Amino acid sequence: MVDESPSLMGQPVAFKDIVDVAGVSTTCGTEVNVGRTPVKDAPVVQRLTAKGALPVAKANLQEFSYGILGDASAYGRVINPRDPEICGGGSSSGSAALVACGALQLTVGSDSAGSVRVPAACQGCLLYTSPSPRDRG
């Protein structure tokens, strides 16, 4: 018998708090955006939920995704679960921390200047980034 359920059926996923999830506040790590609640999912959320993934959390980030340390957010510094003395990296530090501490197996960050690569390296996480720009976002 062939399992025809979506490939990510029931897989919990967190999204960096710069990614819009309908009905959930998107703050971009700043108090300026408190109360900004999108009515539509971002394309990456649409694609993953169509495959059965379950959005369960928004991940903290460097304010406005601007920085590589993960230490500047209205919601506090992201602590590296592997070693609190080492920076969590940024800007997708919260996404990496959720994987590094074992809370989730799948999170979504964003990367323009190392924003996913740096926290993955700092926190010892496996990183996948699509080779195709059309698959991003």
Language-model features, listed with the residues they occupy:
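Structural signal for conserved beta-strand scaffold positions within catalytic alpha/beta enzyme cores
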Residues: 57, 127-129
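Structural signature of FAD isoalloxazine-binding scaffolds in flavoprotein oxidoreductases
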Residues: 117-123
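Short, hinge-like loop/turn segments at secondary-structure boundaries
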Residues: 73-76, 123-127
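Selective for proline/serine-rich intrinsically disordered segments
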Residues: 10, 117, 129-131
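Gly/Ser-rich catalytic/binding loops embedded in alpha/beta enzyme cores
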Residues: 1-113
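Single conserved hydrophobic/aromatic residue that forms the stacking wall/gate
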Residues: 131-137
